[in-house]
Amino acid sequence: YEIHERLVGSEMCIRDSIAALLRKEYPECEVVLKKIVTKGDRILDVPLAQIGGKGLFTKEIEEDLLDGTVDLAVHSLKDMPTVLPEGLCLTAITERANVGDAFVSNKYATFEELPLGSVVGTSSLRRKAQLLAKRPDLEIRDLRGNVDTRLRKLDEGLYDAIILAAAGLERLGHGDRISSLIPADVCLPAVGQGALAIEARTADKEVRDMLSFLNDLNTKQATDAERAFLGLLEGGCQVPIGVHADVEGENIRIEAIIAALDGSTILRDTINGKADDAVSLGQQLGKKMLAAGGQEILASIL
């Protein structure tokens, strides 16, 4: 089986990849990695929000899936559009790793310690809006490139701190660079953050069945709720929307924010219910927040 993974500098660690898990589960199968640089990875001199379009980190990979070049694709779920191309499906969602955002600094231990006017690096509008809502004095500068590049820019003194997904740092062996985790009441994570998604052709039942062992039910229910919320708002990964669903037994709690780009307005709400109703609860929360002012916030952005 041939698998696509994004090639992002030195970031793809084969020992931690889905390929390694497949080889262990099915030692009789040959697993071949095909790597690709996507549009979102190639264009590094323009902020993601200005590139435009959805699927910046998935389009080229999905084209190879559809034409049969590869059998499955591995994505960070947070990069996946809520609507997939016809003929493709998410066949497994792995157990979620650390869902939070990491505060990384060589000078300060926590976000709260940053002095007035500190320079903070992030390429995420979601993070920028929420950080400015708490600290409008901060100077938020765009930060692109792979994880190694971003850490190097911090070490060169271009930023006082940078914000990265904690799961990504930990997967790549950079967990020791995390100064602290940013609390959810300061910065709610992105849809699907911390989970890996396995995409395959809908008609390829054999491959989909083989991948079922990778699926984590709690993570799937939580991320289904988050993606349902995002899908109802029709927001891509470059809109200031944060949402986190937490499954405890049979119950689920979903918390979400819709923010203005400058953080001047943030709408926050939660909903609770049964985990089996994850999708409908995510949609309910989306409708409620749109009616409460979210529509106006999004209209000012889109």
Whereabouts are the PLM-identified features?
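Beta->alpha turn/N-cap motifs
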Residues: 37, 76-80, 164-169
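Short, Asp-centered acidic motifs that coordinate Mg2+ and/or phosphate
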Residues: 70-74, 160-161
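A conserved helix-loop-strand patch within extracytoplasmic ligand-binding domains
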Residues: 77-78, 86-138
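Pocket-lining segment of extracytoplasmic ligand-binding domains
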Residues: 141-225
